[in-house]
Amino acid sequence: MLKKFKDLTLEDMKARRLALRKEYMDLRFKAVVGHVENPLKKRELRRDIARLNTIIHEYAIGIRKV
């Protein structure tokens, strides 16, 4: 999963992060309202969002070069 994120461009990472956030929010609402088929999916999504945030922040502070 991490290797896949490293291959994306900065704009693609930001778009992917937004999509993952929407998916995470939908999953949270489903968990509150009813049954979730895969409860571990929330953890995976949270961690993927954190990974993308880290990579995007590294570009912002100059650790990674575009």
UniProtKB/Swiss-Prot annotation:
GO biological process: translation
Organism listed in the record: Borrelia hermsii (strain HS1 / DAH)
Encoding gene per record: rpmC
Family: Belongs to the universal ribosomal protein uL29 family.
Cystines in this chain: none
Domain of life: Bacteria
A cellular-component GO term for this protein: ribonucleoprotein complex
Lineage of producing organism: Bacteria, Pseudomonadati, Spirochaetota, Spirochaetia, Spirochaetales
One matching Pfam family: Ribosomal_L29
InterPro entries, per database record: Ribosomal_uL29 (IPR001854), Ribosomal_uL29_sf (IPR036049)
The protein, known as: Large ribosomal subunit protein uL29
Keywords: Ribonucleoprotein, Ribosomal protein
GO terms of molecular function: structural constituent of ribosome
